[in-house]
């Protein structure tokens, strides 16, 4: 039992995710098509009590929030080996969406295209590169933030987008080991402020 008169800080947070994923791979005429769907049920809960003393003025933060929503995803990726399997090209698309808000529920708002190439220079050395957009939800703390029991960020948040540009060399040391050196650039947008 906590004596609130003497309590300065108390924090309790829970993130519960129950997940389902189905994936299937098709192979035909040297092509490989990997497809899949996913579903998650998310529960987020936060209780924060914080007394902040600034120049003998007490600022009280007493916050409780519980959030439950569903996440969905679908993807497809097509790969093909060329030049006696020295070159592997791959392209794909993914969408993620959730029922947190109308904007986030539209799967067309969260399309993530990507392409990659891998070229074997020698039996042990290869050059790899990929370009793609990846999307992720904002932090649950931002999604679940409430004022006067209303989710104040619900209409302001969107998926965070990150464009990746990656290139590098991979060297196979043995059957079960490899070393890789890569350069990458990431460009983020949609981060909540």
Question: Where are the model-predicted features located?
Answer:
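Face-selective signature of the C-terminal outer-membrane beta-barrel domain
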Residues: 1-104, 120, 177-180
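Membrane-spanning beta-strands of outer-membrane beta-barrel proteins
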Residues: 15-17, 69-71, 108-111, 160-163, ...
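Membrane-embedded beta-strands of outer-membrane beta-barrel proteins
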Residues: 18-22, 74-76, 113-115, 155, ...
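Surface-exposed extracellular loop regions of Gram-negative outer-membrane beta-barrel proteins
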Residues: 45-54, 124-165, 183-193
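Extended, folded domain segments that form the structural surfaces/walls around functional sites
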Residues: 65, 75-79, 100-102, 106-113, ...
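Outer-membrane beta-barrel "beta-signal"
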Residues: 116, 168-172, 176
């Amino acid at each position: 039992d906590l004596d609130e008169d003497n309590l300065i800080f108390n924090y309790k947070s829970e993130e519960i995710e129950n997940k389902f994923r189905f994936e299937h791979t098709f192979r035909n005429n040297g092509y490989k098509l990997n497809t899949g769907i996913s579903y998650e049920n998310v529960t987020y809960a936060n209780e924060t009590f914080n007394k902040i003393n600034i120049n003998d003025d007490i600022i009280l933060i007493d916050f409780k929030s519980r959030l439950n929503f569903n996440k969905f995803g679908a993807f497809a990726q097509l790969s093909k080996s060329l030049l006696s399997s020295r070159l592997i090209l791959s392209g794909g698309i993914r969408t993620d969406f959730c029922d947190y808000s109308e904007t986030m529920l539209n799967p067309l708002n969260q399309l993530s295209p990507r392409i990659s190439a891998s070229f074997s220079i020698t039996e042990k050395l290869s050059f790899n590169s990929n370009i793609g957009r990846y999307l992720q939800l904002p932090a649950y703390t931002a999604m679940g933030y409430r004022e006067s029991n209303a989710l104040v960020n619900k209409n302001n948040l969107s998926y965070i987008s990150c464009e990746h540009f990656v290139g590098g060399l991979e060297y196979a040391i043995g059957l079960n080991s490899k070393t890789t050196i890569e350069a990458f650039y990431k460009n983020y947008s949609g981060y909540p402020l």
